[in-house]
Amino acid sequence: MADHMMAMNHSRFQDGTNGLHHPAHRMGMGQFSNHHHHPQQHTFNSLMGEHMHYGPGNINANNSIRHAIVTGNVNGGHPNGSMAPASRFNSPFMGPVPNQGAQLTASMQLQKLNNQYFTHHPYPHNHYIPELHPANQINGTNQHFRDCNPKHSTGMPPSVSHVPAAMLPPSVIDTDFIDEEVLMSLVIEMGLDRIKELPELWLGQNEFDFMTDFVCKQQPNRVSC
C-alpha cells in the first residue's frame, strides 16, 4: 500500500510542487498524458471510492479550487461513455450554453414588452397628464411636480380674487361677486336697516309655531307646551 501511494505521489508531483499544475488533474479527466502512469492513476481511483468521482475543478475569486461531486458508478476512474457531456463535467459555476441563449431570448422579450407598455402608457409611474392641467401649458410641459411653498409656486393656479368671474367655469358656485356698496344700497332701499328684529327666514319655522299654538289652545286642561 505504501509503495503504491509513493508511486502515486511521485507521478502527481513530478510536474510541480502540488498536483494542481498537472493538466489531467485540472481537467478532471482521470487520465495522464503518459501511458506509463496509467496504472498508478487506476490504483489511486480505486482507493478514492467506488460511487463518486470528482468533476472539473474551478478557481473562484480567492484562487481556491472547488470540485463538483458527481454521483454515479466509476469504472476505473473513467466516466461512462454513455453519459452526457453536461452531466459528465457538471459544475455549479459553469452553466450549459443553451441556458444563456434562453436568458438572452427572455431578456429581449422583456424589453419588447416594456417598450409596448411605455408606448401605450406614457406616464406609468405618477399617472400625470399635462393636458389636463392648463397651468403647465403656460409654465412649460416639463414641470411635473408642484412646489410646496405657495410663495414660490409656479404650477399652482392663480388666486381666485384676481380672476374675473367670466374666466371661471360656469359650474362653480358663487361666481357673481357682489360689491358691499351695492348690498348696503339694497338694504336701505328695502328698509331693512330700520327693522330691529328680523322675522324668521328659514322654511317651516312659522308652520311649526302655528301648529304648536293651535294644539295648546284646543286642549286647555293639559299642560301647555
From Swiss-Prot:
It comes from Xenopus tropicalis. Gene3D superfamilies: 6.10.140.2200. Belongs to the CITED family. The keyword Repressor applies. Its main location: nucleus. The keyword Repressor applies. Transcriptional coactivator or corepressor of the p300/CBP-mediated transcription complex. May be involved in sex determination, early gonad development, left-right patterning during embryogenesis and differentiation of the adrenal cortex. GO terms for biological process: cell differentiation; determination of left/right symmetry; heart development; positive regulation of cell cycle; positive regulation of DNA-templated transcription; positive regulation of transforming growth factor beta receptor signaling pathway. One of its GO terms (cellular component) is nucleus. It comes from the Eukaryota. Keywords: Activator, Developmental protein, Differentiation, Nucleus, Repressor, Transcription, Transcription regulation. It is found in: Nucleus. The lineage of its organism: Eukaryota, Metazoa, Chordata, Craniata, Vertebrata. This is Cbp/p300-interacting transactivator 2.
